């Protein structure tokens, strides 16, 4: 997973409430186990409109998405985070998220920032013409107009994003400790080695 510390760029000013995982990635895209290409299906129903935000040149490579309340609600599908990541989104800013989506986002290198609605409204206004900057280390969202918003994040999630650690790489970090534990168990209970094989 690519580490995330600072992200700056255009933000897609979606602003819609209750965007569920079926809107983020429709069910017919869930037949794959690979992340590559999932961005093509991201927000498919919204992208049917020829004037949709996602395909406008100014937002095509945007690393930030600004959404409304309850983003990522609905069914639990990690494919939603895969689709956002494949679309190039590294940060989603919204007033609230589904707990499952929020966890899946972090596990896939996407920072879910929670800000109050007044801050969202200001960022939607700025995003129409100017970039937004997110600094995870300092937990801030800033604009070129001296707007500065702070956000909270669980320290463990913050560490995982800053270091680019998913569940596998986090476990691999403890490889030496796991090996030492297994060696100690083998010495304390040699009969277990024979049972396990």
Swiss-Prot record:
GO biological process, one term: L-leucine biosynthetic process
Keyword Chaperone: no
Protein name (database record): 3-isopropylmalate dehydratase small subunit
A Gene Ontology molecular function term of the record: 3-isopropylmalate dehydratase activity
Gene3D superfamilies the record matches: Aconitase, domain 4
HAMAP family linked: LeuD_type1
UniProt pathway: Amino-acid biosynthesis; L-leucine biosynthesis; L-leucine from 3-methyl-2-oxobutanoate: step 2/4
Highest taxon of the lineage: Bacteria
Organism: Sphingopyxis alaskensis (strain DSM 13593 / LMG 18877 / RB2256)
Gene symbol of the encoding locus: leuD
InterPro entries (UniProt xref): 3-IsopropMal_deHydase_ssu, Aconitase/3IPM_dehydase_swvl, AconitaseA/IPMdHydase_ssu_swvl, IPMI_Swivel, LeuD
Pfam families: Aconitase_C
EC number(s) reported in the record: 4.2.1.33
Complex and partners: Heterodimer of LeuC and LeuD.
Protein's UniProt keywords contain Amino-acid biosynthesis: yes
Catalytic reaction list: (2R,3S)-3-isopropylmalate = (2S)-2-isopropylmalate
Function: Catalyzes the isomerization between 2-isopropylmalate and 3-isopropylmalate, via the formation of 2-isopropylmaleate.
Cellular component terms (Gene Ontology): 3-isopropylmalate dehydratase complex
Family statement drawn from the similarity comment of this UniProt entry: Belongs to the LeuD family. LeuD type 1 subfamily.
Keyword annotations: Amino-acid biosynthesis, Branched-chain amino acid biosynthesis, Leucine biosynthesis, Lyase
């Amino acid at each position: 997973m690519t580490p995330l510390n600072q992200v700056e760029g255009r933000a897609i000013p979606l602003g819609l409430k209750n965007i569920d995982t079926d809107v983020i990635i429709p069910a017919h895209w869930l037949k794959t186990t690979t992340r590559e290409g999932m961005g093509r299906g991201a927000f498919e129903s919204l992208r049917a409109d020829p004037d949709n935000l996602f395909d406008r040149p100014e937002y095509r490579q945007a690393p930030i998405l600004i959404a409304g309340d309850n983003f990522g609600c609905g069914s639990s599908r990690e494919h939603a985070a895969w689709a956002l990541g494949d679309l190039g989104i590294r940060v989603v800013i919204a007033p609230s998220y589904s707990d499952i989506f929020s966890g899946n986002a972090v596990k896939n290198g996407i920072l879910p920032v929670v800000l109050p609605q007044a801050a969202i409204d200001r960022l939607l206004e700025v995003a129409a013409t100017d970039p937004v900057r997110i600094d995870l280390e300092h937990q801030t969202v800033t604009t070129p107009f001296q707007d500065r918003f702070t956000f909270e994040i669980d320290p463990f999630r913050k560490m995982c994003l800053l270091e680019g650690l998913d569940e596998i790489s986090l476990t691999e970090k403890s490889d030496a400790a796991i090996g030492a534990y297994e060696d100690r168990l083998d010495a304390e209970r040699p009969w277990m080695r024979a049972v396990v094989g």
